[in-house]
């Protein structure tokens, strides 16, 4: 699964909107929109990853309880899986 798929899955499971996630996380709605559409993904070391996991966990408490660590693990794993090895190979070949 890609980052956007996991983010959308948790928003759906928590029955939350992008606006609620933005308000809870402090991340702008436009950035969340880009994350949700896949137009942008955070760097694996970005504080947005932890912020999103924490915020989704907080939002889950209004409906179902989702563990922050589980969310964080899924989000970071998806970013590791998105690495473009073909692009790296092409860049190295151009050196």
Regions found by a protein language model. Name each.
Residues 1-6, 14, 29, 85-92:
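Basic, amphipathic alpha-helix used for nucleic-acid engagement in HTH/winged-helix/SANT-Myb modules
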Residues 11, 36-40, 60:
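Short amphipathic alpha-helical interaction patches enriched in hydrophobic/aromatic residues
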Residues 26-44, 73:
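Recognition helix of helix-turn-helix/homeodomain-like DNA-binding domains
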Residues 1-20, 24, 50-53:
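A short, Lys/Arg-rich alpha-helix, primarily the initiator
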Residues 8, 18, 37, 66-69:
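Extended interaction regions within the primary functional domain
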Residues 64-95:
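Short, charged recognition helix plus adjacent turn
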Residues 1, 43-46:
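Non-catalytic, surface-exposed connector residues within folded enzymatic/regulatory domains
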Residues 45-64:
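DNA major-groove recognition helix of helix-turn-helix/homeodomain DNA-binding modules
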């Amino acid at each position: 699964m890609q980052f956007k798929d996991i983010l959308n899955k948790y928003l759906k499971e928590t029955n939350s909107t992008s606006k609620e996630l933005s308000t809870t996380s402090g991340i702008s709605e436009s950035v969340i929109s880009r994350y949700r559409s896949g137009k942008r993904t955070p760097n694996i070391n970005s504080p947005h990853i932890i912020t999103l996991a924490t915020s989704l966990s907080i939002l889950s408490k209004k409906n179902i309880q989702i563990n922050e660590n589980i969310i964080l693990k899924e989000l970071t794993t998806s970013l590791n899986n998105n690495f473009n090895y073909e692009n790296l190979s092409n860049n190295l070949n151009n050196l």
